[in-house]
UniProtKB/Swiss-Prot annotation:
Keywords: ATP-binding, Kinase, Magnesium, Metal-binding, Nucleotide-binding, Thiamine biosynthesis, Transferase. Pathway: Cofactor biosynthesis; thiamine diphosphate biosynthesis; 4-methyl-5-(2-phosphoethyl)-thiazole from 5-(2-hydroxyethyl)-4-methylthiazole: step 1/1. Its EC number is 2.7.1.50. It catalyses: 5-(2-hydroxyethyl)-4-methylthiazole + ATP = 4-methyl-5-(2-phosphooxyethyl)-thiazole + ADP + H(+). This is Hydroxyethylthiazole kinase. Its cofactor is Mg(2+). GO terms for biological process: thiamine biosynthetic process; thiamine diphosphate biosynthetic process. GO terms for molecular function: ATP binding; hydroxyethylthiazole kinase activity; magnesium ion binding.
Amino acid sequence: MSNSASSFTGVSSGYTAGTPVPADSPIRDNIADAVRRVRETTPLAQSFTNFVTINLVANAQLAAGGTAAMSFLPDDVIETAKIAGANYINVGTLLPFYKDALPEIAQRLNYLDKPWVLDPVAAGIGRTRTAILQAFKAAPPTMIRANASEVIALANMWGLNTETVGDASEHRPAGVESVDDVESATGAAVALAQYLTEQHAKHSSHDASTRCAVAVSGIADLVTDGETVYRLPGGSAMMTKIIGAGCSLGGVAATYLAVSDPLTAALSASLLYNRAGEVADTTSHGPGSFQVAFLDALWNVTAEQVAESEILVQ
């Protein structure tokens, strides 16, 4: 399965909830620094991503300034992880042997202290995918990037979401599409971010004060480290008309994770996508030209433009 981006970022639709982050906030400095560092150092972010969107994922990572490596064999993933700055696992398209291989890869990444991003595409659909995602609870990622329904489904799957009303099955994605709005996933996103942080603090040799992050894509994206919830209005509705916008965002988030902390990486990737989508909107004439213009915008948008984007604290 593949994220078609119908739940990805879109026009702000007048979304105004939240307090604006000041122009002189250190958060904005961190974002600008992350964008610059990626372009200056071209970090390697390895991706185990789905077959449908692999081309856009790789091209987006390159356009953002990083280096891409696309791996599918478990031994390739482990060997490449040793030299990669960060890694990305997307469960959109799976083969039966991945049921055992992917949890082992996750355990190995954490043993090596290698940060990684999880995109739980279509969480809650299919026994193989469900078994893999359940196993990730014992070897959790550093960051999660997903749509609202996937975030809710994963939190329910891990027994973390106490705010969902009704049967958890009601919140399963319709295929890869979200049937929930971003706002309804706030509690699940916070719970997941807190769990990731707690687990990595126990087992990682990295700074225990570094918090993990969850990014929820939607009309006004949500990013949280489990303590603070940020909303990021903006982007383009045309994102809903190209396959792989959400998947490629996960790959770019991994690129930023190679040079920055999880919260900064999640904010930087989402804001870059919002700004690039807005730029592409002004020159494109349909889905085909939009995708080309979008990749060009990922390349051309400046660090200052990304850092100056609208950021609200919810």
